[in-house]
Amino acid sequence: MGSLTNNDNLHIFLVCFIGQGVVNPMLRLGKAFASKGLLVTLSAPEIVGTEIRKANNLNDDQPIKVGSGMIRFEFFDDGWESVNGSKPFDVWVYINHLDQTGRQKLPIMLKKHEETGTPVSCLILNPLVPWVADVADSLQIPCATLWVQSCASFSAYYHYHHGLVPFPTESEPEIDVQLPGMPLLKYDEVPDYLHPRTPYPFFGTNILGQFKNLSKNFCILMDTFYELEHEIIDNMCKLCPIKPIGPLFKIPKDPSSNGITGNFMKVDDCKEWLDSRPTSTVVYVSVGSVVYLKQEQVTEMAYGILNSEVSFLWVLRPPSKRIGTEPHVLPEEFWEKAGDRGKVVQWSPQEQVLAHPATVGFLTHCGWNSTQEAISSGVPVITFPQFGDQVTNAKFLVEEFKVGVRLGRGELENRIITRDEVERALREITSGPKAEEVKENALKWKKKAEETVAKGGYSERNLVGFIEEVARKTGTK
């Protein structure tokens, strides 16, 4: 992709929360802007910088050329270690801590850029750092949000925040929810941060903070595509300035971008093993970068995988020192029975795995990144949601996009999925009429995803239109 006329002086500044699931789409967006000829800075707490450097074998934060533009990193000390030392990590305490320190650190960084001749043209934040909009407003810098969930989830949060439709409450926890342009959501299909029984109310509170600041954003960029959620997008466009620009991971890669990713862990080499497997025989199993399953659930999954006799590539993350999780243990006879039809890794290059011809299906937690990557790669799914928007995504994958089969309904079920259920789902997604149906549908979505990010496609036009809007606001065009 080439640069846009007269936009060489535009400087887009992206601000991220910690967490691979939010850093990855921000980095993809940054690369997309840079490939259009813009200067892009990605900023986040230093812990993000530490993990990205380690995973990508980087020695410093030198700018990276992408097309005719540039992307660089500016990580900042959030002061967490000096205040909390070796105390167990508490995400809600950290969110509030970052709110306070970020409001102090960000203006200093922005003013420094102005003094050194690279003033920031636009601030873009993700929903877990709503305070960035306040900083932008105080400095009169145009501000936008990159929404990294579906438009369906955005609609749920918007209608909840404004009290426009009834949602589950403490006294009526099993209310189903009807939102404009959407199928009925059962009480356990609503993003569960909004449910009174959620064990993670702080995430809902934090995300809803973005909706209090929505008027301070001139645009809501969405990592989704119109063809996927057109009715919901049409309805929400009447209420908010939405621009779908996804799927960001499908935007053609510029070879000069070095292949740097937002991964926090080094990926294991899976290609040689996948190359050794026949076409459409391997089920990829991963529950993302945050979900950590109970040992009992891992054991049931292991036996379900063994009993299905399906080939598998299974991501089992190492335990987290920060959170204090224990390592997962596979049954003693697992490898004796699995033989060479399976491989277990600590982390994988997911985009490449899903694009590999050996991959036939994806058992996924249904995070939005994984959801889009599966659909846009033409890979059917087994939905195994846990919390947050995952339960909503699972519904759409199975009932609306028709690319998968359901394995569970999320943590509100409060049960262990059995080995028999796992075996049934694996068999259903790999052979028989259901497998053929979901594969055909997945390939249709893949084609639409490729078309929307190609030159002249709906998402690509929105991306260009956003850049032009920033240029007008800053007087550079």
Curated annotation (Swiss-Prot):
Q: Which PROSITE patterns does the entry link to?
A: UDPGT
Q: What GO annotations for molecular function exist for this entry?
A: quercetin 3-O-glucosyltransferase activity; quercetin 7-O-glucosyltransferase activity; UDP-glycosyltransferase activity
Any one biological process term the GO annotation gives: luteolin metabolic process
Q: Summarize tissue expression.
A: Highly expressed in young leaves, with a lower expression in mature leaves. Higher expression at early stages of petals development than at the late stages.
Instruction: Tell me where the transmembrane regions lie.
Output: none
How pH affects activity? Optimum pH is 7.5 (at 50 degrees Celsius).
Indicate yes or no for the key word ATP-binding: no
Q: Which domain of life is it from?
A: Eukaryota
Transferase listed as a keyword: yes
The record's comment on protein family reads:
Belongs to the UDP-glycosyltransferase family.
Pathway, per UniProt? Flavonoid metabolism
Annotated residues that bind UDP-alpha-D-glucose are located at 289, 347-348, 365-373, 387-390
Cited CDD domains: GT1_Gtf-like
This chain belongs to the protein called Isovitexin/isoorientin synthase UF6CGT1
Catalysis: reaction(s): apigenin + UDP-alpha-D-glucose = isovitexin + UDP + H(+); luteolin + UDP-alpha-D-glucose = isoorientin + UDP + H(+)
Pfam families recorded: UDPGT
Q: Which organism is it from?
A: Gentiana triflora
**EC number(s) in its UniProt entry?**
2.4.1.-
Keyword set, alphabetical order = Glycosyltransferase, Transferase
Thermal behaviour (record text):
Optimum temperature is 50 degrees Celsius (at pH 7.5).
Main role? UDP-glucose-dependent glucosyltransferase involved in C-glycosylflavone biosynthesis. Has a strict stereo selectivity and shows a preference for apigenin and luteolin as substrates, but could not recognize flavonols, anthocyanins and xanthones as glucosyl acceptors. No activity with orientin (luteolin 8-C-glucoside) and luteolin 4'-glucoside. Can use UDP-galactose instead of UDP-glucose as a sugar donor, but not UDP-glucuronic acid.
What is the activity regulation entry?
Inhibited by Hg(2+), Zn(2+), Fe(3+), Co(2+), Cu(2+), Al(3+) and Fe(2+). Slightly enhanced by low concentration of DMSO (below 3 percent), but gradually inhibited by higher concentrations. Requires UDP to be active, but slightly inhibited by UDP in a dose-dependent manner when concentration is higher than 0.32 mM. Activated by sucrose in a dose-dependent manner.
